[in-house]
Amino acid sequence: MSTSSALSSYYVDTIMGHEAEDVYGARYIQGSHTAPARPSGVVENADFSSCSFAPKSAVFPASWSSVHQPSTAAVSGIYHPYVHQTHLSDNRYVRSWIEPVANHISLTGFHPNSRHSGTKTESLPPKRTESAAFETETPSVPEFSLNAVSESADKATEERVGSDNSSHGEPKDEKQQQQLDPSNPAANWIHARSTRKKRCPYTKYQTLELEKEFLYNMYLTRDRRYEVARILNLTERQVKIWFQNRRMKMKKMNRERSSKDP
C-alpha cells in the first residue's frame, strides 16, 4: 500500500512540476487517510494481527467543489510564452511572405545585409529623366525637298501614260492585221459591227458554196446538210441556221419588191 501511494505521489509531482509546489500545495486540502471499511460478509481472522498504517495526505480532496479554475500565474511554471529573439532575426530567418516584395520594393524594416532565403535581388535600371526619354523616343523625320517630290510625281505620270498607250496600241495593231488578212473570217462582210452582237463568221468560200446550194434548193434534207457541212468544214447546225436566215432574207426581199411595184 505504501508503494502504491509513493508511485501516485511521484506521478502527480511529475505532472504538476517542481517550480510551483507552493502554489499547488495551497490548493489542495490536507486530510488524514482513513482505512476503507470492510464489507459485512468478510469475517475477521483471529490468526492475523491488525495492521496499522501511518497517516498520509490524500491525493485528491474530499469534494470536487473545492477545485478552482487555474490561473495564468499558477501555470507560468509549465507554459513558457514565446519571446522574440532579436539577435537571430537579422541573420537566420526572415518572414517568407515578404520575400517576393523584397525583390522589387525596398523595405525600411529590414537590415540591408539580411538574407532572403537565397534569393537574388534584381538591380533596377537607372531612372531616366524626362528630357532624356523625350530625346530617345522622338523619331527622326527625313528631310524632303520640293524638287524631289515633283520629280517623283512626273515619273509616276509618265509611267501611267506609257502603260495606257501600250495597252491601247496593241489591240489597234491586231485589228488592222485582221482587216488586211483576206483569209480571216472576221474580216468578211457577214461580220457585224462591234456595237452589235457578233454573228458566226463564215469565209468567202463558205458563203459562195452555201449560196450555190441555196439556188439549187432552198430546203436541204438532213443527209444533204451533213454532206455540205463536211465539205465546208462546218457543223450541221451552222448550215441549218444559215439556210434559215437566207430564206428569211429572200422573203423580205420579195415583200419589198411587191410593195414597190404598183
From Swiss-Prot:
The segment annotated Disordered runs over 107-187
Q: Where is the composition biased (Basic and acidic residues)?
A: 152-176
Under InterPro entries, the record lists: Abd-B_homeobox_TF (IPR050803), HD (IPR001356), HD_metazoa (IPR020479), Homeobox_CS (IPR017970), Homeodomain-like_sf (IPR009057), Hox9_activation_N (IPR006711), HXA9/HXB9/HXC9 (IPR017112)
SMART domains, sorted: HOX
Q: Name one GO cellular component term.
A: nucleus
Gene3D superfamilies (alphabetical): Homeodomain-like
The protein's location, in the record's own words, is: Nucleus
Q: Which domain of life is it from?
A: Eukaryota
One example of the protein's molecular function in GO is: RNA polymerase II cis-regulatory region sequence-specific DNA binding
Polar residues compositional bias, start-end: 177-186
One Pfam family cited in the UniProt record for this chain: Hox9_act
Q: Which GO terms describe its biological process?
A: anterior/posterior pattern specification; DNA-templated transcription; embryonic skeletal system morphogenesis; proximal/distal pattern formation; regulation of transcription by RNA polymerase II
Q: Which residues bind DNA?
A: 195-254
Q: What are the entry keywords?
A: Developmental protein, DNA-binding, Homeobox, Nucleus, Transcription, Transcription regulation
* UniProt similarity note: Belongs to the Abd-B homeobox family.
Query: Its biological function?
Result: Sequence-specific transcription factor which is part of a developmental regulatory system that provides cells with specific positional identities on the anterior-posterior axis.
PANTHER family, alphabetically? AGAP004664-PA (PTHR45970), HOMEOBOX PROTEIN HOX-D9 (PTHR45970:SF4)
Provide the protein name: Homeobox protein Hox-D9a
Name its species.
Danio rerio
Q: Top-down, what is the taxonomic lineage of the species of origin?
A: Eukaryota, Metazoa, Chordata, Craniata, Vertebrata
